[in-house]
């Protein structure tokens, strides 16, 4: 299994250098950001899915949209890596009963459930959380919503 946490931190530390970036990363490390899913049913609905999704968005943005000498690498890293920070501490693992087709027995299986502690709009919540630690440019805030 890839070490998505190390990949994320490497990209983040190389690109995100503005005041407060270190405090934001420390906060992320105190949450489940690096182990949480990105969703309950769709993309990244697995352990570490959130950090994996964030890295995938970063790689896609850099490959398809970044122009060296024109674009700001920090802005791309901030927008891609942090667009879903609102999903940190957003899911919890619960269990439900599912019938095993082979045995006919009911079994408890884990699944991800939303446990929203801060009911705020999805993109707006990411901006709100980021801004606790570091300032965003207007275009970064808009791109994250």
Enumerate the language-model features and the residues they cover:
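Divalent metal-dependent catalytic cores for phosphoryl transfer on phosphate-bearing substrates
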Residues: 38-46, 52, 59, 63-145
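Non-catalytic interface/linker regions that flank or bridge core catalytic/transmembrane domains
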Residues: 1-36
């Amino acid at each position: 299994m890839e070490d998505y946490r190390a990949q994320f931190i490497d990209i983040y530390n190389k690109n995100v250098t503005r005041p407060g970036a270190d405090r934001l990363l420390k906060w992320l490390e105190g949450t489940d950001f690096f182990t949480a899913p990105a969703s309950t049913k769709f993309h990244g609905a697995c352990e570490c899915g959130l950090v994996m999704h964030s890295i995938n968005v970063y790689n896609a943005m850099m490959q398809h949209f970044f122009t060296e000498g024109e674009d700001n690498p920090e802005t791309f890293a901030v927008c891609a890596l942090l667009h879903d920070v609102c999903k940190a501490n957003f899911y919890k693992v619960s269990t439900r009963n599912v019938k095993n087709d082979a045995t006919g027995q009911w079994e408890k299986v884990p699944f991800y459930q939303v446990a929203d502690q801060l009911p705020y709009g999805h993109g707006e919540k990411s901006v709100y959380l980021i801004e606790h630690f570091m300032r965003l440019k207007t275009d970064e805030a808009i791109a994250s919503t």
